[in-house]
Amino acid sequence: ALYGATFYDVILKDLIPMIDRTFRTKTDREHRAMAGLSWGGHQTFNTVLPHLDKFSYIGSFSGGIFGLDMKTCFNGVFADADKFNKKVNYFFLGCGTEEQMGTKKMVDSLRKLGIEVDYYESQGTAHEWLTWRRCLKEFVPHLFKH
């Protein structure tokens, strides 16, 4: 499977149901979020974007979609900005100012399509834990506002 695609099935079919059985969770899409850092941010996109019927919050810290056309990737999920923006309660991308990952370029492409995305830059940090802790601090409060 391309880039470990079966891992996404494990998240959707095994991990999330196990969490819901083990902990007192709200199981509807309006209360489900996924975020990840670095490659985990990329995995977040691969898990969430094809399954917006299951998630309404998306966070990626130093992860992104690179080398793909934003309008056509993930079966064109970003092509209809109004539909995407209504479905997703909060969309967050963050990275460090010293990273060369192209996250800002991705944000600019998404905004050009009309996608509502919150962008954060961690000042003076690179692809490192301080960046991701700061991104988490910025992201998490939004999970409780909508």
Give each language-model segment a name:
Residues 1-146:
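Non-catalytic cap/lid and distal C-terminal segments of serine-dependent acyl enzymes
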